[in-house]
Amino acid sequence: MAKKKIAISCGDIQGVGLELILKSHKEVSALCEPLYLIDSELLERANQLLNNAYETKTLNTLAINAPLPLLNSGTIGKVSAQSGAYSFESFKKACELADDKEVDGICTLPINKLAWQQAQIPFVGHTDFLKQRYKDHQIIMMLGCFRLFVGLFSDHVPLGAVSQLIQVKALVRFLLAFQKSTQAKIIQVCGFNPHAGEEGLFGKEDAKILKAIQKSNQTLGFECFLGPLPADSAFAPNKRKITPFYVSMSHDVGLAPLKALYFDESINVSLNAPILRASTDHGTAFDIAYQNKANNKSYVNAIKYLA
């Protein structure tokens, strides 16, 4: 059986992305046919900064239509508009290749959101770009590993704005799209307020969540969604035995327990998109850039998910 062709966007080159590419190539190429969306010259520079520890000649690369950022001992670990622009163009090219069916999926290495902002890129990050590019699809951010997956009803929005987003119709649409994408038989839904609202004592949002759960289960014809569960106990061991699939109303409520349990191995997946996309579930790690300290478990797991 032929290996799948996966486009790998380079992420912010001042972080750990290029180290992950170089140190993981042998393992990744055993899983898929990787196409690295980066100018080969930058990989050579990265390898020099890593004391020429890796082989670079056998990597299949595709040059990006963007100015080459500086990459040297003075730039690594620092926010750069030029690096932000380059990482965006690498990611956009990956999407174009996937749209044209030239690759089977894309793996995105971590970007720096401030670098994108400095480069005047009008998107908060990868998922925001995908939501704008594929407006007819409800793109869902799901993070985790095969032991625990968390779907985020809201992702990169201020916590104070989440309450207004919790509306029955929008949540039903989200829940059904999440179930369709994952094919999960049981999904536990975290509440929004302390004690999942305590029957209205602590806010009205959880009553809306309950109504959305009931409507979604009715549409599916079986009791798929459980909750709303008090979020402070939703991830207890006895709860995680029920199902690996969860939904969180906000970013940190779902991701704090996930990263406490499975930080090194978790991945980020864009569900319900017309293309297949997975990513590492960590940032650029500027503090350890080019020190040969990057853990590649999340990156390899993202490739495994795509392959």
Swiss-Prot record:
Its cofactor is Zn(2+); Mg(2+); Co(2+). Its EC number is 1.1.1.262. The active site is located at the dimer interface. Substrate binds at H126, T127, K259, N268, R277. This is 4-hydroxythreonine-4-phosphate dehydrogenase. Homodimer. It is found in: Cytoplasm. The gene is pdxA. It comes from Helicobacter pylori (strain Shi470). GO terms for cellular component: cytoplasm. Pathway: Cofactor biosynthesis; pyridoxine 5'-phosphate biosynthesis; pyridoxine 5'-phosphate from D-erythrose 4-phosphate: step 4/5. Belongs to the PdxA family.
